[in-house]
Amino acid sequence: MLPTCERYGMGVIPWSPLGGGWLTGKYRRGQEIDLTSGRAGRMPQRFDPSLPGNARKLELVEQLVGVAEQAGCSLTHLAMAFVVAHPAVSAAIIGPRTMEQLTDILAGADVVLDDATLDAIDAIVPPGTNVHVDDAGWQPPAIAQAWRRRRPIGTRGA
């Protein structure tokens, strides 16, 4: 879909660039996840750390935190910059519920990821990977090519 949208100049706004909160740092290994309230309360099967898919998410989050630290940004900023680095993406949904979340997301608006950082992310979660069965979908061959998923370095900013 993304190559087609790019070819015809159609805008793309990806859904859930922060992975339902997983890419904000809210859910980390060693921290208790409240399965009785909020999104985790509504969909505990997607947040219960005792389930293998969610345990895997926690492992991946920790690896991505390391990439964010190496890049000099927060996990939230890494995730948002990753999404807008794709040449077919017009904008990213930010979806803050609080002023604190809005302030944090806006503070990362100028974060631009270099190719090494994008490669590190791809190595942790290869393109088209669905960590949780509920996220499963079809992977078109075009997303396996890094150059199709990245704006030129000078055009990656907001």
Q: What name fits each language-model region?
A:
Residues M1-A40, S74:
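Aromatic-lined glycan-binding groove of carbohydrate-active enzymes
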Residues G53, A81, I94:
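Glycine- and other small-residue-rich loops at beta-strand/loop junctions that grip anionic moieties
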Residues G19-G20, V83, T98:
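Positions that flank functional sites
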